[in-house]
C-alpha cells in the first residue's frame, strides 16, 4: 500500500508529464484538527491533493498556497505546501453543511487564489472565479487561462479499510511543441479509467503499468509528503511578548492564564502568570540591545 507519497513521471515519447499523490495520515491529521462536516473534509482533501500536485511543479525552493474564499457557509478553506512536501491546512465555516454539499453549496459566490512564494524572488498570485462544478475544474481553468498549459486533474477522496484517504493524478503538456493534441487525449482517456481503490492502495509502478502499459513511462524517485504545522510552545511565547504587557495582565486577571491555539493541528499552549513574567524578563535585554 502506498501512503503519503508523491510520484512524478514522464511520457518520454509524448511530451507529457504526470504526477501521482497518495495520502492517508497527512490527510487525516488535517481533518482531525476540528470537527469538520463530511463535505468539508472532502473539500479539504481535494485542496490537499491539488496543492501537493502543484508544489511538485516548483523549480525552486518555496511554497504554494491554494485558498478558497466565498460568501457561503464555508468562508475559507486553505492548504499550504512547500518544495519539501510539508503541508498544512485549515477551513472556517458556519452552520450546518449537508453531507452531499457541492463546491458551490459550500463556497457560494467565491474565488480561488493560488499564491506562489519563492524563498528568493518575487511572490506571484493568481485569482480565478469558481468556474466549473468541481475544484479540479477550477484548477484546470486556472492553468488554461494563466499558464496556457493543457492540464487535467483527477482527485478522489474516500475511505479504505475504515481510514480516510485522498489521492489524485495530474497530467500536463510539456511546452516543447513536440506533443500532439491526440497524444494528450489518449492519456486523458487512459487516466480517466483509474478507480478509487487503485489510487488508494496500489504502489506507483503497479498503478502506472495498469493505466499506461502500452506507453513508455519514466518514473522518478518518490517524495514523502508529511503534515507539518510549524507551531511550538517557543513560537507561542514569542507571539505573546509582541503584545503590550498591560494587555496580557488584563487577560491574566480575567482568565488566570494566556492560551494560544493552533488552527492547523488543534494544539493549545497555555502560559500562567509566572511563565508570562519569565517570557518578558528574557525578552527585556534583547529589547534594550535593539535600542
UniProtKB/Swiss-Prot annotation:
Subcellular location: Cytoplasm
Gene3D superfamilies from the UniProt entry: helix hairpin bin, Hsp33 domain, HSP33 redox switch-like
Keyword Cell inner membrane: no
Keywords, sorted A to Z: Chaperone, Cytoplasm, Disulfide bond, Redox-active center, Zinc
Family designation: Belongs to the HSP33 family.
GO biological process, any: protein refolding
InterPro entries in the record: Heat_shock_Hsp33, Heat_shock_Hsp33_C, Heat_shock_Hsp33_N, Hsp33_helix_hairpin_bin_dom_sf
This protein's name: 33 kDa chaperonin
One Pfam family linked to the record: HSP33
Taxonomic placement: Bacteria, Pseudomonadati, Pseudomonadota, Gammaproteobacteria, Vibrionales
PTM info: Under oxidizing conditions two disulfide bonds are formed involving the reactive cysteines. Under reducing conditions zinc is bound to the reactive cysteines and the protein is inactive.
GO MF term list: protein folding chaperone; unfolded protein binding
GO CC, any one term: cytoplasm
Disulfide bonds: 229-231, 262-265
Domain of life: Bacteria
Reported function: Redox regulated molecular chaperone. Protects both thermally unfolding and oxidatively damaged proteins from irreversible aggregation. Plays an important role in the bacterial defense system toward oxidative stress.
Amino acid at each position: 500500500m502506498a501512503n503519503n507519497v508523491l510520484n512524478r513521471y514522464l511520457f518520454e515519447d509524448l511530451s507529457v508529464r504526470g504526477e501521482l499523490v497518495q495520502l492517508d495520515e497527512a490527510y487525516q491529521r488535517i481533518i482531525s484538527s476540528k470537527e469538520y462536516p463530511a463535505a468539508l473534509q472532502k473539500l479539504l482533501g481535494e485542496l490537499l491533493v491539488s496543492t501537493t500536485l502543484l508544489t511538485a511543479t516548483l523549480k525552486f525552493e518555496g511554497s504554494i498556497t491554494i485558498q478558497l474564499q466565498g460568501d457561503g457557509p464555508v468562508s475559507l478553506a486553505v492548504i499550504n505546501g512547500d518544495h519539501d512536501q510539508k503541508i498544512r491546512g485549515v477551513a472556517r465555516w458556519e452552520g450546518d453543511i449537508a453531507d452531499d454539499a457541492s463546491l458551490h453549496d459550500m463556497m457560494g459566490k467565491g474565488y480561488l487564489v493560488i499564491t506562489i512564494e519563492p524563498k528568493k524572488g518575487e511572490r506571484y498570485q493568481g485569482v480565478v472565479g469558481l468556474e466549473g462544478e468541481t475544484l479540479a475544474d477550477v484548477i484546470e481553468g486556472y492553468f488554461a487561462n494563466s499558464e496556457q498549459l493543457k492540464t487535467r486533474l483527477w482527485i478522489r477522496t474516500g475511505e479504505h479499510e475504515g481510514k480516510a484517504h485522498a489521492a489524485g493524478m495530474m497530467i500536463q503538456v510539456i511546452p516543447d511543441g513536440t506533443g500532439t493534441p491526440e497524444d494528450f487525449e489518449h492519456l486523458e482517456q487512459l487516466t480517466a479509467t483509474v478507480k478509487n481503490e487503485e489510487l488508494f492502495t496500489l504502489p506507483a509502478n503497479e498503478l502506472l503499468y495498469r493505466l499506461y502499459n502500452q506507453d513508455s513511462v519514466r518514473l522518478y524517485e518518490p517524495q514523502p509528503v508529511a503534515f507539518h504545522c510549524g507551531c511550538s510552545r517557543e513560537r507561542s511565547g514569542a507571539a505573546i511578548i509582541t503584545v503590550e504587557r498591560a494587555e496580557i495582565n488584563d487577560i491574566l486577571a480575567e482568565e488566570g492564564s494566556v492560551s494560544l491555539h493552533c488552527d492547523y493541528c488543534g494544539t493549545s499552549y497555555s502560559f500562567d502568570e509566572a511563565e508570562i513574567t519569565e517570557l518578558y524578563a528574557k525578552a527585556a535585554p534583547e529589547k534594550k540591545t535593539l535600542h
